[in-house]
Amino acid sequence: VERSRGLGDVYKRQVAINVTARQARKLMVAQAKARYAVNAAGRRHLKDLVQRKKATNTSLSAELHIEKMRNDLGYFQHRPTESFKGRDVLRRAPAHVKARVLKSSAMTALTGDGANLSKGFLVEFKSGHVGMVQRRIGSSSSHTVTERGRPRWRNKDGKVEKLVTMGSPSATAMHSTVWPYVEPEVTEYLYDRLMEQTERVIARAKARKG
């Protein structure tokens, strides 16, 4: 009887922990979306948070995990949203692309530093992702043609300058930042689920006794 009672106690904790882990994931994704000005691609990155480890009867712990490299600014809100090529750069592209990382911040023009890095602009990569990059002023790149075999832009010295990705917080960093905000709610949720499971065990025990 005591052994069965012990196994039942372990099982109810296991269930409560796994349910809480799933709820924690939902809360973290929602909080990150509320804080960060991610676009559709950025929101998909946030949802890559998964439950890698589930609680079992031998290990009462669960683990959430995400494997993502650092995002570029193209995963956050920016205007315009399309990249411009060839003559469209002169005809349609604005003087500066604007972007923001936090929803609480205003859109900022990506003007560059005027010395080492050019203003920011959008480039469509072979994967189809539209990323935010800058040119390293005065540098020389060996990649002189585009993915489609077209000549790349050259500076006044005839050099094709190297492109540098404009970095921004990774999905991992964003989730780490929002965790302290959701932790109290997750703790309370776990307590409620443990109480719920306990009440179910008690109810079943009473039912068996008649």
List each model region and its residues:
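Single conserved hydrophobic/aromatic residue that forms the stacking wall/gate
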Residues: 1-11
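Long, contiguous amphipathic alpha-helices that act as assembly "spine/axial" helices in icosahedral shell
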Residues: 9-32, 36, 178, 182-198
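Translation machinery proteins
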Residues: 30-62
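Charged, low-complexity interaction tracts
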Residues: 49-210
